[in-house]
């Protein structure tokens, strides 16, 4: 912060000496020099370094879509990949975070706002394994992802409830989808990543029917951090499901001013009724959560609007 104040002081002095005609030139020179990068564009200089046994989760702001990057001990996992037009943003974010290889890639379900740029991420980095539900979609977006996976010499794997994947020694438990559904949202892969005494539950876009089916399986879905399903739609996050998660924090990935009115007031009320502190990408931008296995902390790109 001290360095920031020094640069602002120098900038003000320069503007005072040269007059208003040179404001644009001076600003451009300062910006191009890169000295303000870490203050103006945090993601440009962001590099993730997390010890083994700890984890950092980046809920990347991709508007009305989902994308989360998990990091632990130099290993990375990507859950969903935003919309089609998020490719450059996501790939650049991952590159600047120091990603060379994605050990696990999860497309929770084949809707464009969740797998839109997965093909770009798969093509840009070395890939360990790709997981998607055993359901297809007759869309170019879905076919692009399959082509990207094939281009890496891999096959999409279809996890089932009860499976436990490994992410740098951290268990990734699969809870859903439980069965076949007519609604693609309910085909969402629902998973929990545990780190020591803490846990993170990712729910894709699973809706109430799918949530009840998961509860009926008797899984322990308790978590400290809940990635709220379906951008905060009232058709998800039923009270019983929230009660069983017993989460302290809720993260909603949602676009500002979206046409669906997400997150809906009834969903926010449910989350508040269960005492969850709510973070929203439409208000706070990219949200980062850190855990050492005991403690959890949050930071965000910007402060919430009053």
Language model segments and positions:
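Non-globular, low-confidence helical/coil segments that flank catalytic cores
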Residues: 2-306
